[in-house]
């Protein structure tokens, strides 16, 4: 549930990266270009050997926090370690090969203020193939409601959750 006194809650965005340079610039740009601006990026460099760090450093934004691990850790463990570094009221995950629509955070935060009983909100998502072809994964016809947290986690839809 959203804190009723917080008009502009901080959203902690976790990005776990292991050699994710290929689409990293587009992914981070989609976060920087959000209409909702009160976010922090916890960039968890999971022992990358490519130019991921150099791509990240092209963005000089005080909201970006860089952490490097000296040993590779499984994704679930890396995410849990990154969660410990967050300071936001909300947590979301953005993978290095994902892009967010510009109003994603704004619309999700608005939903929390409209319904004080919400614990989680999520979005539809698309797969992009070679940046041109798209395939919609979830349609409005079968979006679950009610007690949905476990359903979302069971179907690996963590990228759309806030």
Give the location of each predicted region.
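A structural helix-start
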Residues: 17-25, 45, 49, 53, ...
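Conserved nucleotide-sugar donor-binding catalytic segment
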Residues: 13, 75-76, 84, 123, ...
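Conserved donor nucleotide-binding strand/loop of the catalytic core
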Residues: 53-87, 99
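Short aromatic/hydrophobic "clamp" motif used to bind/position activated sugar donors
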Residues: 91
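A conserved acidic beta->alpha catalytic loop
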Residues: 30, 45-54, 71, 95
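Short alpha-helix within the catalytic core of nucleotide-sugar-dependent glycosyltransferases
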Residues: 25-29, 53-54, 88, 101-113
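N-proximal low-complexity "stem/linker" segments adjacent to membrane-targeting elements
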Residues: 1-32
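Conserved donor NDP-sugar-binding/catalytic core segment of glycosyltransferases
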Residues: 103-136
